[in-house]
């Protein structure tokens, strides 16, 4: 009988690193023999007051092509009714575990509700894959939502010792068991922290016919190119990179910043 695993987080129709990560995780798990993978996704990830469009309308790639991953878009941040629908779907699938992607403190509200129902009505393992613990903006509201959202979990995945230490700081009275091989603690009062290196994505492949020099000529780029890729947010440090690059251009004329 196949092991069932649910990857909860933004599906492949969304843009952004977390959507890519969750999709890549589902794809890799699907490649394992005897594993049946379900990807349950948001339809809307953030409060309605957030104006940004997160749907990827440009990419024509199907990152899950050729897999058996079953994708369902169901969870709407702004419609609590869908939180209950999400729980019922998870209960119906009855997986061995649900891996929740944790990357925004405000999602602690719906995720807490969903995880709490799973904990109360099933024996499914609840795993939170932590892309951070301490919010970058670090407001008191974010801290409360983070603590509320994460406390239901049975196990946690972290990608740095710093993240594990932050988790211990917000739950100072909770005993933890830290492992790097996925072993779960046998102690009832402990929760497991699984430390894994951040993986290299397998959903992207280089274009063998990509002409690097032609691209540089078209975009007036110099020999050496420094690339910033991703959303522009203060904590990502783009302003520091620009300042550092400005100093570099005082000494060299063969560099570009893209």
PLM features: what roles do these ranges have?
Residues 190-192, 205-220, 225:
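A short helix/loop element that forms part of the nucleotide-sugar donor recognition site in Leloir-type
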Residues 162, 182, 199:
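Carbohydrate-associated surface elements
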Residues 122-127, 132-152, 159, 165, ...:
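Nucleotide-sugar donor phosphate/pyrophosphate-binding loop at the beta->alpha transition
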């Amino acid at each position: 009988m196949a092991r069932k695993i649910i990857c909860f987080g933004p599906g492949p129709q969304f843009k952004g690193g977390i959507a890519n990560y969750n999709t890549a995780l589902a794809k890799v798990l699907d490649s394992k023999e005897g594993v049946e993978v379900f990807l349950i996704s948001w339809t809307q990830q953030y409060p309605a007051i957030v104006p940004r469009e997160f749907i990827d309308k440009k990419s024509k790639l199907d990152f899950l092509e050729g897999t058996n991953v079953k994708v369902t878009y169901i969870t709407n941040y702004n419609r609590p009714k869908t939180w209950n629908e999400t729980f019922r779907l998870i209960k119906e699938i009855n997986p061995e575990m649900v891996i929740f992607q944790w990357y925004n403190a405000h999602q602690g509200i719906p995720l807490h509700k969903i995880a709490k129902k799973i904990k109360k009505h099933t024996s499914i393992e609840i795993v939170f894959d932590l892309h951070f613990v301490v919010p970058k903006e670090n407001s008191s509201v974010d801290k409360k939502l983070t603590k509320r959202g994460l406390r239901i979990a049975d196990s946690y995945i972290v990608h740095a010792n710093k993240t594990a230490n932050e988790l211990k700081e917000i739950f100072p009275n909770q005993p933890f068991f830290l492992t790097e091989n996925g072993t779960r603690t046998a102690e009832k009062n402990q929760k497991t922290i699984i430390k894994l290196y951040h993986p290299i994505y397998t959903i992207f492949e280089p274009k063998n016919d990509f002409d690097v020099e032609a691209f540089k000529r078209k975009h007036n780029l110099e020999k050496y190119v420094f690339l910033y890729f991703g959303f522009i947010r203060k904590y990502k440090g783009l302003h520091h990179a620009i300042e550092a690059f400005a100093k570099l251009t005082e000494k060299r004329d063969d560099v570009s910043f893209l």
